[in-house]
């Protein structure tokens, strides 16, 4: 019997408007797409390192800027102003609340750097319904690796069959 539900944050409980954010900064659509690829599809997986919380925001910014000096202003602004990146999904938040009222345990399992997680969840209504969470920056492990899931289950003594 299902007693607990585990949600991801990004692209589940909130949406990202990363491309529009870069356009708001002053990039055209083509440049915004390219800069997004530079950050999110980086062959060195620098954004994944950022999610793991093993390096400071500033060191991640500096590394990206060193790799892409022509885009350093946009990259620096983008990472430093992550509060503009997320979009609330109130209909999903309402559903989370309904599940909580029905007695389900509600948990978060997500890849996030600490600074962005705090900016994206600070005023999120769904947070009041959360029974526990494991975010990559907390244990320096990320999805899809099983370790982060096991850490969530162990911390909150969740029966994996429920």
Name what the model sees in each region.
Residues 4, 73-107, 118, 146:
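Short, acidic loop-to-helix structural element flanking the phosphoryl-transfer center
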Residues 27-39, 69-80, 160-161:
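Short, surface-exposed acidic
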Residues 1-42, 66:
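Active-site neighborhood of HAD-like aspartate-dependent phosphohydrolases
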Residues 114-162:
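Substrate-recognition "cap/lid" segment bordering the active-site pocket of phosphatases
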Residues 8-11, 53, 99, 108, ...:
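Generic structural signal for small/hydrophobic residues in well-ordered secondary structure
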Residues 1, 101-104, 156-162:
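Glycine-rich phosphate-binding loop signature in dinucleotide/nucleotide-binding domains
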Residues 12-13, 18-20, 112-115, 139-140:
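Short, solvent-exposed loop/turn segments at secondary-structure junctions
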Residues 47-77:
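A metal-dependent, Asp-based hydrolase signature
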